[in-house]
């Protein structure tokens, strides 16, 4: 397990949560990002957090004792493709799980399965419904970071664009259900989502 890193992408704007930085909001006594980190650390040894510079102090306090490496966006608010690129650029292990900072139900067993399936490929990316989940996937850091950089240089910030140049495998719904929980993909985007998470996790 010493060959794995977890990357939390936390640099997005919390537009549907008002002026609150949702990454550090309290969820039943634990900051949201720490809930994500705790679940991620069940299957990785190293933690990287991608964020804006103005978030770093708050996130460091929320993750005290977990010793994360911070990968700060040089240019903020360029979207998740840039966040993935920046986070993966600091990774030194062969594979890394990349997840969003707002997924409090992250399933370690499903992440373990993604690591297993990614072996010998550039990526293992779930598709629980019609859409891919690139912010709940496992990557070889260098190929994915390069693919993200190429997409951004081409002014194509769509989060699925980098996958087209990778040797990636798709994890379909049936395999997800067999090896984990679909709830793993649920995120906290609105005040209603936050209240639901507090009730479920209290």
Swiss-Prot record:
Cofactor(s) this protein requires: Mg(2+)
CDD domains, per database record: MobA (cd02503)
Keywords: Cytoplasm, GTP-binding, Magnesium, Metal-binding, Molybdenum cofactor biosynthesis, Nucleotide-binding, Transferase
Chain positions recorded as GTP binding sites: 9-11, 22, 50, 77, 102
Catalytic activities: Mo-molybdopterin + GTP + H(+) = Mo-molybdopterin guanine dinucleotide + diphosphate
Listed GO CC annotations: cytoplasm
Top-level EC class: transferase
Cellular localisation: Cytoplasm
EC number(s) on file: 2.7.7.77
Keyword set includes Cytoplasm: yes
Positions with a binding annotation for Mg(2+): 102
Any Pfam family the entry gives: NTP_transf_3
GO biological process: Mo-molybdopterin cofactor biosynthetic process
Function: Transfers a GMP moiety from GTP to Mo-molybdopterin (Mo-MPT) cofactor (Moco or molybdenum cofactor) to form Mo-molybdopterin guanine dinucleotide (Mo-MGD) cofactor.
This protein's domain notes: The N-terminal domain determines nucleotide recognition and specific binding, while the C-terminal domain determines the specific binding to the target protein.
Protein name (Swiss-Prot/TrEMBL): Probable molybdenum cofactor guanylyltransferase
Native organism: Natronomonas pharaonis (strain ATCC 35678 / DSM 2160 / CIP 103997 / JCM 8858 / NBRC 14720 / NCIMB 2260 / Gabara) (Halobacterium pharaonis)
Lineage: Archaea, Methanobacteriati, Methanobacteriota, Stenosarchaea group, Halobacteria
Gene this chain is encoded by: mobA
């Amino acid at each position: 397990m010493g060959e794995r890193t977890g990357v939390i992408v936390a640099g997005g704007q919390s537009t549907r949560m008002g002026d609150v930085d949702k990454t550090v909001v309290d969820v039943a006594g634990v900051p949201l990002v720490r809930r994500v980190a705790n679940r991620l650390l069940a299957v990785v040894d190293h933690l990287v957090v991608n964020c804006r510079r103005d978030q770093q102090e708050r996130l460091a306090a929320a993750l005290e004792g977990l010793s994360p490496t911070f990968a700060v966006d040089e240019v903020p608010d360029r979207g998740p493709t840039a966040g993935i690129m920046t986070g993966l650029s600091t990774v030194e292990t062969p594979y890394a799980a990349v997840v969003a900072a707002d997924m409090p139900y992250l399933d370690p067993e499903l992440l373990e399965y993604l690591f297993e399936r990614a072996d010998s490929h550039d990526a293992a990316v779930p598709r629980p419904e019609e859409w891919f989940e690139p912010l709940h996937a496992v990557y070889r850091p260098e190929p994915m970071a390069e693919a993200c950089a190429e997409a951004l240089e081409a002014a194509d910030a769509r989060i699925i664009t980098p996958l087209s140049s990778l040797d990636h495998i798709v994890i379909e719904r049936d395999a997800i259900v067999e090896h984990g929980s679909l709830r793993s993909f649920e995120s906290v985007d609105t005040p209603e989502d936050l209240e639901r998470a507090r009730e479920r996790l209290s």
